[in-house]
């Protein structure tokens, strides 16, 4: 394989909903380029892309697969991405390191929720988009309707380059309005027959050709002037206008294929090779200092590692993009994230499960290495004299969580190691060892996401695991003022223990004025503040601790011990054992003994006094509330809203976005436990959602009583 220069390289992501045919398209592209002699299929479990056992088990792509084809003296690096929303991390990774997105649309269904999700990410990243309508041989495909729907969603930027003469099982020909030719195939596919457009199609073809020319001309002043003068453009001018329109996202060309028979795939590849922008024609990326980094092969050497694969008999395979410079076997590089040194071994061009040895990779290219010493997903390796990092891939918050346990305690350590290893392969996993909940929790993107994790743990790692709903991280607080006092006294021969603490508690809010006077049962307590400590608590909220003791009733040296006693109770609230928050504590009096008082005595006295005061101060349980955005087809809006209301959600607003309804709500975390499953069931898998932590709010009284009763029962069981 020859060395490709930066201006000969194009990086392309294949994205779209599950079942839109991305892996099948990848097979056809490899076949057309002569990389493989026979097309595999998902059903036969022999595709280049879906080579991991878990993918073959479920019949879905789980990981993004990187491969390349050499086409007309150009190198096309292509990433075949998972379509399921549960594996959206793979698509996000690919869209960040490639320069163009081909968004596949299943001709039977038109734009689906996966189409919308991927388009939104391309919008955020400002990536060029080509729409590709697949499955034109389906009975349910109505191309004219589909294009009308797409233009309603994406506007006039969505411009057909091709249209089929007919759809359904008899599909075998299309009209290309860029080249103004008819392409047709034998029923089994094969080489296209290229002919002039039939007379009965000329009017429609000319109308679409004119729309394409006009859309292309809008991207260049000179082309626009020529279009106004001559009402046409040459083929080269048309290509140039489309290329500029792709870069500025002012045009979204629509192509047609039947990927299963390779019909239209060769023509698509010609367009990718001839028209879509090269790496060095795209906007520059930025390092973490905000500096632009150009894909210049003569620049400083810098590699960004965007993916790690774990392969049997090989170990870690590390995939990277050459951000600048050129990388060669034997180069010495420094990991700017970890401070370690790496020597480059054999370099490879990516080919799915296979790798093609190469000696050099230039700026903008994608490649991989095996068995690196200390490189993780997201790391940057730099050459001598440069220290920069890249951190441009942002993954969505998790949407589905489960507590995970190994079936035997002896395997717990092995389980943690396996989970951390799998997170290298899929950074959307979040593994949390919760000290608060005493659980190991895995956070993912959906039920299917966790199901594949379980399969891999059991089949690849030989670990038996169980899942269950995680506990909810409730909080406790108070709603009114209260006071309490407690004397801790212990005498059993020798030195005794003595400490007495009088304190007041009240709800705390940011910016509250310092206390001056309190009244309880007609008695007035004036405060004389000697010291104040405000703590931002690790679990959220604040504790304000005030020393208002006068007359030497308690030595100042015992105040840290009293604060420790208060913090002990804040870490285990009296209602449910949950963390407490947003409390102000004023220690205003107490007693000590000249011999028997010590730090332990005051810690114990403070615990009891605080607990008694907390219970008398209108204690309440708080639950985590999340912001929820649901993207749903209008037909399902009523069912989705009804379901949310049954989950104690508060609807905050509704809006239309790209053909879907966007519903915004606030919902308790407890009600999100199985929401991904319910939403999929309600909408036939045609909706998606995102979540983000918002705040803690009071639980309803009936739920509070239930939670307290459950906690008391747990404590009783532990004591027995």
Regions found by a protein language model. Name each.
Residues 78-80, 255-256, 442-443:
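Short hydrophobic beta-strand that contains or immediately precedes a catalytic carboxylate
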Residues 1-105, 109-111, 160, 204:
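P-loop NTPase switch module centered on the Walker A-proximal segment
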Residues 46, 72-76, 96-102, 216-226, ...:
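Gly-rich Lys/Arg/Thr-decorated short loops/hinges at beta-loop-alpha junctions or inter-strand turns
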Residues 6-9, 23, 45-46, 59-63, ...:
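Amphipathic alpha-helical transducer elements in NTP-driven molecular machines
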Residues 1-20, 107-312, 333, 367:
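P-loop NTPase catalytic nucleotide-binding module
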